Amino acid sequence: MTIGLSVTNDVFARDILTVAQLNQAVGQLLERSIPSLWVRGEISNFTQAASGHWYFTLKDSRAAVRTVMFRSRAAQVGFVPRPGDQVEVRARVSLYEPRGDYQLQADGMRRAGVGNLYEAFLRLKAQLQDEGLFDPQRKRQPARLPRAIGVVTSLHAAALRDVLSALARRAPQVPVIIYPAPVQGADAAARLAARVAQANQRAEVDTLLLVRGGGSIEDLWSFNDEALAREVAASDIPVISGVGHETDFTIVDFVADLRAPTPTAAAELACVPRGDLLAALRHTAEWLARAQQRRLDQAAQRLDRAAAMLTSPAQRLAHQQERLNTLRHRLASAWRGPQGHRVARLDMLAQRLAHRRPDTGRAAERSAALLAQLGRAQARLAAARQARLDTLAAQLRALDPQHTLARGYAIVRDAAGAIVTDATRLAARDRIEIAVARGRIGADVTDIGTPDGTDGNPALRRG
């Protein structure tokens, strides 16, 4: 680097300078002539003062320089360096005038190599985005009512405890299947990708959570792996990522179907609270009952209107009988006339009566057909409503914890009645109670198993 020196002050034109004048002039010269720059080196002699300022030496194999980082800048670094750490410091060159020592005044710091990692992150992000792997249209919404939820993470991760706690609180009826894999290290990305593929092969869960807690960019780097990102993008099971904290973003977050800011938030996105589901089912059942009653009332009203419009055959026969009696009376009165006149008159009346006689048989058949049609309509409506109620009842029974126990799961409580989710909370000879589908079992703890530290164990189940 070529640095042009330009001194506007005529202090150096004096014959004699004091030490203070010299140091002040040199300090101004350094600050005006050398721009802010990045310097790579090893941390040594690190001290964090009570004021919050950092004082350390930045060195390599051939030289060293004193460095200061004031509290406001140090608070933005995100980690506290230790002696021996390789770092990259953004600083300005200055002079500590009381001693005449030149030093670096740092206003930024990152671990050495982070710049290269970030550049690799941006290249892979741009490549996968160009391929359409970030396209919102290819992403799917997780199942609203999952039959089981899978979790891909380390068995020893705090994130796993957070996820299991959130799921037990919100949806205790949903089984959780853990696919254990390391979340950092040389082979972590490959192991995580293998677990995602295994979950798809088994097809035993409806939603997959890929989670880990926070950390540095190096700690989270496994989740920026291209092979893992492509495995997540190709998953037939919707994937929710919950990696790091809210401000952390990885490549997996961009290809996942849904991104959560934390592992706990990922668990909350994966299921609807059980209380909300039961309330919705009750509301739906009440609505269906009211709707069915309205349909039945409307059908009854239509039946009443149809009955009112249909003249009773008995009434028509009675009317015709009355008419016939009247004609007979008139015939008897007219019998006293000439015989021929009476016979002709009688024939005429008989013909008129024949024309006015109601077809009672046809009217009765039509009435019976209408009643049968109305009965069939009511039966179909009642059958449809009963089938819908049966379906809702089956869904409600599926949410019952007793139904889950009937499938072979069990609930373990300690002596205080609290549900046991962590074996390490118990000790030998502790009294426990095991609830199964039909009854409860009292037992004493004789042995406690703990994880052996190997992340390649078969998938564990929690019912």
Curated annotation (Swiss-Prot):
ATP-binding as a keyword? no
Q: Where in the cell is it found?
A: Cytoplasm
Q: What is its main location?
A: cytoplasm
A single Gene Ontology CC term: exodeoxyribonuclease VII complex
Which residue ranges does UniProt annotate as crossing the membrane? none
Catalyses: Exonucleolytic cleavage in either 5'- to 3'- or 3'- to 5'-direction to yield nucleoside 5'-phosphates
The processes (GO biological process) annotated in the record are: DNA catabolic process
EC no.?
Answer: 3.1.11.6
* Sorted UniProt keywords: Cytoplasm, Exonuclease, Hydrolase, Nuclease
Q: Which GO terms describe its molecular function?
A: exodeoxyribonuclease VII activity; nucleic acid binding
List, alphabetically, the InterPro entries matched: Exonuc_VII_L, Exonuc_VII_lsu_C, OB-fold_nuc-bd_dom
Q: Which family does it belong to?
A: Belongs to the XseA family.
The UniProt subunit note reads as follows: Heterooligomer composed of large and small subunits.
Q: Give the protein's biological function.
A: Bidirectionally degrades single-stranded DNA into large acid-insoluble oligonucleotides, which are then degraded further into small acid-soluble oligonucleotides.
Its protein name is Exodeoxyribonuclease 7 large subunit
Native organism is Bordetella pertussis (strain Tohama I / ATCC BAA-589 / NCTC 13251)
